[in-house]
Amino acid sequence: MAKKEEYVRKPDWLKIKLNTNETYTGLKKMMREKNLHTVCEEAKCPNIHECWAVRKTATFMILGDVCTRACRFCAVKTGLPNELDLQEPERVAESVEIMGLKHAVITAVARDDLKDGGAGVFAETVRAVRRRNPFCTIEVLPSDMMGNDDNLKTLMDARPNILNHNIETVRRLTPRVRARATYERSLEFLRRAKEMQPDIPTKSSLMIGLGETKDEIIETMDDLRANNVDIMTIGQYLQPTKKHLKVQKYYHPDEFAELKEIALSKGFSHCEAGPLVRSSYHADEQVNEAQVREEARKAAAKS
């Protein structure tokens, strides 16, 4: 008889209260009417009800809803994507305006089937949002675009307020966790983004609970700082379906608090760490606090 798989029980601190008020329902209806996708829904984010119903924010996912990769932690659909929708940038910009966002996050599925990795549509979405929403800060969260410098330059030339690219996991686990991605290529992507536009903050996220050690987490912090990453987020990995990688450990909130302090001591201008933290969670607060910390640091250096 086959041995039944053992699963780590989800702790109480990961239980959340769902809030599906009229704001949440209205935003969901608008997304469907405009044929837009959000990573909040596609990736089964645990914070969707707080962000949509309480904070009235969302992370737009462009370039369709089918990814060319099949990472073992991610719930986004995989397969052969549809053709590009060239009207998508304007629909995103209009939705940002209707929602009255002060900070918009734009992410995308990986489009390894496209020569430019989708960089052209990504850049046009940034420009479209800025034209209609001049006071809205814009954060972009692209794939590694297969490490293509020209594609990254296309995106950086659009001048987003933050370039976010997630390292996702520690070096040792990357081959098992991230399909068609490498740890070193992600670091290089972040380094090159900073070299192209030194004044644009860079950001990366690490999910933990996949079997990494504390030393490996700290090593990842050091690697990100060595490549001039400014902002870091650390969150608990949650298994989206039984087909995905199992959770090896649920970290206690106190452990996240300790990791945050370590990250800040390494020189990150901001670190958000907690069981339910995701790359885009409270992103508006992250960019504001990071700017304040950086200005204070520059002022101290001059004195």
Curated annotation (Swiss-Prot):
Cofactor descriptive note: Binds 2 [4Fe-4S] clusters per subunit. One cluster is coordinated with 3 cysteines and an exchangeable S-adenosyl-L-methionine.
Catalytic activity of the protein: [[Fe-S] cluster scaffold protein carrying a second [4Fe-4S](2+) cluster] + N(6)-octanoyl-L-lysyl-[protein] + 2 oxidized [2Fe-2S]-[ferredoxin] + 2 S-adenosyl-L-methionine + 4 H(+) = [[Fe-S] cluster scaffold protein] + N(6)-[(R)-dihydrolipoyl]-L-lysyl-[protein] + 4 Fe(3+) + 2 hydrogen sulfide + 2 5'-deoxyadenosine + 2 L-methionine + 2 reduced [2Fe-2S]-[ferredoxin]
Top EC class of this enzyme: transferase
CDD domains registered for this protein in UniProt: Radical_SAM (cd01335)
Cofactor: [4Fe-4S] cluster
Domain of life: Bacteria
InterPro entries associated with the record: Aldolase_TIM (IPR013785), Elp3/MiaA/NifB-like_rSAM (IPR006638), LIAS_N (IPR031691), Lipoyl_synth (IPR003698), rSAM (IPR007197)
Ranges in a coiled coil: none
Record-listed E.C. numbers: 2.8.1.8
PROSITE patterns: RADICAL_SAM (PS51918)
Binding residue positions for [4Fe-4S] cluster 2: 67, 71, 74
Keywords, ordered alphabetically: 4Fe-4S, Cytoplasm, Iron, Iron-sulfur, Metal-binding, S-adenosyl-L-methionine, Transferase
Domain Radical SAM core: 53-269
CC terms in the record's Gene Ontology section: cytoplasm
Localization: Cytoplasm
GO molecular function ontology, one term from the record: 4 iron, 4 sulfur cluster binding
Pathway: Protein modification; protein lipoylation via endogenous pathway; protein N(6)-(lipoyl)lysine from octanoyl-[acyl-carrier-protein]
Main subcellular location of this protein, as a coarse class: cytoplasm
Matching SUPFAM superfamilies: Radical SAM enzymes
Positions of [4Fe-4S] cluster 1 binding: 40, 45, 51, 280
Family: Belongs to the radical SAM superfamily. Lipoyl synthase family.
Record-given protein name: Lipoyl synthase
Protein source organism: Halalkalibacterium halodurans (strain ATCC BAA-125 / DSM 18197 / FERM 7344 / JCM 9153 / C-125)
Name of the gene: lipA
